[in-house]
C-alpha cells in the first residue's frame, strides 16, 4: 500500500453537499481495512519524534482518524464538537463560514495548562474548523504542537488561515 494508492481511492462526488462543490469522499479508504490501517500508520509515522500529550479532533470526520491515531500512539483523545453535544461545562469558539458563522466547543477540563496537543482532521480545505479547534486548545492553556491531515485541497489555501502552526498533510489535491 502507498499514499498514492490511498489518494486514488478517495473519490470525487460532484455537487455535494451543494452545487459547485467537488466533495472528496474518504469512505472507500475507511471501508478498506488495509487502506485505513495504512493511513493511520502513515499519520503516526509523520508524528515520529514529536513529544505531545493529547490528540484533539473536530467532529465528525476528524474523529475517524483522531481517535485511532491517539490509540496507536498511546495518548489521550479530545473531541471538539458542535454546540450542545458535550455533557460537561464547555468553552466555545465562533468562526466564519462562506455563508455565515458556526461554532465549536471543547470541555473546559479537556486540556491542561502546558499540555502539548496535535490536532487531527481528515482534510484541510479553508482551515476554518481547524483554526477554531486550535484556538479552543490555546484558550485552555494548551500548546498546539502540530496540525495533521490525511488530505489537503491546496487550491483553497487553508494553510494561510493556519499561518504560524506546523502543518502536515500526507496527500495533496
Curated annotation (Swiss-Prot):
Enzyme class: transferase
Catalysed conversion reaction: AMP + diphosphate = 5-phospho-alpha-D-ribose 1-diphosphate + adenine
Compartment(s): Cytoplasm
Pathway: Purine metabolism; AMP biosynthesis via salvage pathway; AMP from adenine: step 1/1
Main location group: cytoplasm
Transferase is among the record's keywords: yes
Pfam families found in the cross-reference section: Pribosyltran
Statement: the UniProt record of this protein carries the keyword Glycosyltransferase: yes
Gene3D superfamilies per UniProt: 3.40.50.2020
Family: Belongs to the purine/pyrimidine phosphoribosyltransferase family.
Assembly with partners or alone: Homodimer.
PANTHER family found in the cross-reference section: ADENINE PHOSPHORIBOSYLTRANSFERASE
Known role: Catalyzes a salvage reaction resulting in the formation of AMP, that is energically less costly than de novo synthesis.
Name the UniProt record assigns to this protein: Adenine phosphoribosyltransferase
Organism: Thermoanaerobacter pseudethanolicus (strain ATCC 33223 / 39E)
Amino acid at each position: 500500500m502507498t499514499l498514492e494508492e490511498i489518494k486514488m481511492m478517495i473519490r470525487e462526488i460532484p455537487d455535494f453537499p451543494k452545487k459547485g462543490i467537488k466533495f472528496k469522499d474518504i469512505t472507500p479508504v475507511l471501508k478498506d481495512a488495509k487502506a485505513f490501517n495504512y493511513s493511520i500508520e502513515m499519520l503516526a509515522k509523520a508524528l515520529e519524534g514529536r513529544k505531545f500529550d493529547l490528540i484533539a479532533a473536530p467532529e465528525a470526520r476528524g474523529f475517524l482518524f483522531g481517535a485511532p491515531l491517539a490509540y496507536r500512539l498511546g495518548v489521550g483523545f479530545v473531541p471538539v464538537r458542535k454546540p450542545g453535544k458535550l455533557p460537561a461545562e464547555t468553552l466555545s469558539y465562533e468562526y466564519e463560514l462562506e455563508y455565515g458563522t458556526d461554532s465549536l466547543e471543547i470541555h473546559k477540563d479537556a486540556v491542561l495548562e502546558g499540555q502539548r496537543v496535535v490536532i487531527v482532521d481528515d482534510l484541510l480545505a479553508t482551515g476554518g474548523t481547524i483554526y477554531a479547534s486550535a484556538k479552543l486548545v490555546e484558550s485552555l492553556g494548551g500548546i498546539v504542537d502540530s496540525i495533521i491531515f490525511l488530505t489537503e485541497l491546496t487550491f483553497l489555501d487553508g494553510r494561510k488561515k493556519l499561518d504560524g502552526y506546523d502543518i502536515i498533510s500526507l496527500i495533496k489535491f
